[in-house]
């Protein structure tokens, strides 16, 4: 019996520890519902909000209550309206604040990128800001949902239609057409959407290339010499190794001037295409057009392990080649920009966190692209909308209550949709390399052979090389620091 009691106590303690280990989950005010079904009674797939949850979003709940309203929470608690300063205390009420048992995450979907064809910078911008379906309407509806007035032209009753797009310095302004007159309070004060501060960042994973034109390897030099065994025993335990540095000369041309504005976020290495040995790097935060050609040096080696009979020599042949390669290339650049909304806020309802009712003129800038700060980040404000006092700009819970969660998710996904511009050009390179070291049939020798024009190398055990290497000539062909060595094999 004592053993059973101890086991039961252990289960209780384990349950408490598991409950304590579970982290608190956010409660999004836009998903709250007030049910008038009795004390702590909710509709299907809802549960009562507990005291801790209500405390975390008290200002949001109180803002949705009548002056003297009292509504229930879980476990015998109630929350009281603004006339009671939102007090939370034990009590009972006929209505209950409830929350979904399986709440929607409410995340902003990430859409596939909007690809803009390659062109000059102004071409890329023009295509973006004149795209009605993918840009003008989504940004216009964003302004409308936030409470900006008159986000449309005089010749249409719909948001985002009859809009004029004009160049403004290095940016663009989108505003409803004001021709022909209008009716309504300050209807001539159309909300404007300014698009400015464009930036372009190279996406290295987007590399594509067209048809590759690659020349067959061209023989530029043949070096012939001898491996000579002057000893009385066959020699097969030595490696003959050719080492050299070779330069690959490369160049790239950029089809459009937009490449001058494209930067690399991280150090970028050019992808290898074909058989050329190439190592091109562009430093982080550099213009794509800052490096359009150069030379890269690669250290290479070839080895062979010949078997040379006693008092014999075998011919050694090394062939040196060059190869050319060229192809058109394309990368994508991620486009980012500032989106500035300017106009007056509607008195009948707006999403500024203080909800002013005096129709104030309001400017606010969002950054579409990499995170800059909280005030300009739609995604940050949206994700933190469950924390009262954290988001001191727009009341996204209000926009959801007014327009619905799916509507806001769909609109913000379009506003935040990635935009990519094509960067195209042509690439070419020339490289040099050595073929395999070829070994011929042995030839008997009567005595050691020497040549004043040859490189004479010995392993100190009777095997030596006589191979002519003209450093100046080889350098002119693109081969530098050429060396031949004969060394005991490491894995005999």
Curated annotation (Swiss-Prot):
Site (Important for oligomerization): 155
Region annotated Interaction with glycans from host GPI-anchor, chain positions: 346-355
Record flagged with keyword Disulfide bond: yes
Main location class: secreted
Recorded GO CC terms: extracellular region; host cell plasma membrane; membrane
Segments forming a coiled coil: none
A biological-process GO annotation: killing of cells of another organism
Paired cysteines (S-S): 42-98, 182-187
Chain intervals for the UniProt region annotation (Part of the transmembrane beta-barrel after proteolytic activation of the toxin and insertion into the host membrane): 256-288
Keyword line: Cytolysis, Disulfide bond, Hemolysis, Host cell membrane, Host membrane, Membrane, Secreted, Signal, Toxin, Transmembrane, Transmembrane beta strand, Virulence
Region (Interaction with host N-linked glycan) residue spans: 68-84
InterPro entries (UniProt xref): Aerolysin-like_C, Aerolysin/haemolysin_CS, Aerolysn, APT_dom, APT_N_sf, CTDL_fold
A UniProt-annotated Pfam family: Aerolysin
Record family assignment: Belongs to the aerolysin family.
Assembly and interaction partners: Homodimer in solution; homoheptamer in the host membrane. After binding to GPI-anchored proteins in target membranes and proteolytic removal of the C-terminal propeptide, the protein assembles into a heptameric pre-pore complex. A further conformation change leads to insertion into the host membrane.
Protein function: Secreted, cytolytic toxin that forms pores in host membranes after proteolytic removal of a C-terminal propeptide, leading to destruction of the membrane permeability barrier and cell death. The pores are formed by transmembrane beta-strands and are approximately 3 nm in diameter.
Protein name according to UniProt: Aerolysin-4
């Amino acid at each position: 019996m004592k053993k059973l009691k101890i086991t039961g106590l252990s289960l209780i303690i384990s349950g408490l520890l598991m409950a304590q280990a579970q982290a608190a989950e956010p409660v999004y005010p836009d998903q709250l519902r007030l049910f008038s079904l009795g004390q702590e009674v909710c509709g299907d797939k809802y549960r009562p909000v507990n005291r801790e949850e209500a405390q975390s979003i008290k200002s949001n709940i109180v803002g949705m209550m009548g002056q003297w309203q009292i509504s229930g929470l879980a476990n015998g608690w109630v929350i009281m309206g603004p006339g009671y300063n939102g007090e939370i205390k034990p009590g009972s009420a006929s209505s209950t604040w409830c929350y979904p048992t399986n709440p929607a995450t409410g995340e902003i979907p990430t859409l596939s990128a909007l690809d803009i064809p390659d062109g000059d910078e102004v071409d890329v911008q023009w295509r973006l800001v004149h795209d009605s379906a993918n840009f003008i309407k989504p940004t216009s509806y964003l302004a409308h949902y936030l409470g900006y007035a008159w986000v449309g032209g005089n010749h249409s009753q719909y948001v985002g239609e009859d809009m004029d797009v004009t160049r403004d310095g290095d940016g663009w302004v989108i505003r409803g057409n004001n021709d022909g007159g209008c009716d309504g309070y300050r209807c001539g004060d159309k909300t404007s959407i300014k698009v400015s501060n464009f930036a372009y960042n190279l996406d290295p994973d987007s590399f594509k290339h067209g048809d590759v034109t690659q020349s067959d390897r061209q023989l530029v030099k043949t070096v012939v010499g001898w491996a000579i065994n002057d000893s009385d025993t066959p020699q097969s335990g030595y490696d003959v190794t050719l080492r050299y540095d070779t330069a690959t000369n490369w160049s790239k041309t950029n089809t459009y001037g937009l490449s001058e504005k494209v930067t690399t976020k991280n150090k970028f290495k050019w992808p290898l295409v074909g058989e050329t040995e190439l190592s091109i790097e562009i430093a982080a935060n550099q213009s794509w057009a800052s490096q359009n050609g150069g030379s890269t040096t690669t250290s290479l080696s070839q080895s062979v392990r010949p078997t040379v009979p006693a008092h014999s020599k075998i011919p050694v042949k090394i062939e040196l080649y060059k190869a050319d390669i060229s192809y058109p290339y394309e990368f994508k650049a991620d486009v980012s920009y500032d989106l500035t909304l300017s106009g007056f806020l509607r008195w009948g309802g707006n999403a500024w966190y203080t909800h002013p009712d005096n129709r104030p003129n309001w400017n606010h800038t969002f950054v579409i692209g990499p995170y800059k700060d909280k005030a300009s980040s739609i995604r940050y404000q949206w994700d933190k909308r469950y924390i009262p006092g954290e988001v001191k700009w727009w009341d996204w819970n209000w926009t959801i209550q007014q327009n619905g969660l799916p509507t806001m998710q769909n609109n913000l996904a379009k506003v935040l949709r990635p935009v990519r511009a094509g960067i195209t050009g042509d690439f070419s390179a020339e490289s040099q390399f050595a073929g395999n070291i070829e070994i011929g049939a042995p030839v008997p020798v009567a005595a050691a052979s020497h040549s004043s024009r040859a490189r004479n190398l010995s392993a100190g055990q009777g095997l030596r090389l006589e191979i002519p290497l003209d450093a100046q000539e080889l350098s002119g062909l693109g081969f530098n620091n050429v060396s031949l060595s004969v060394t005991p094999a490491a894995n005999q």
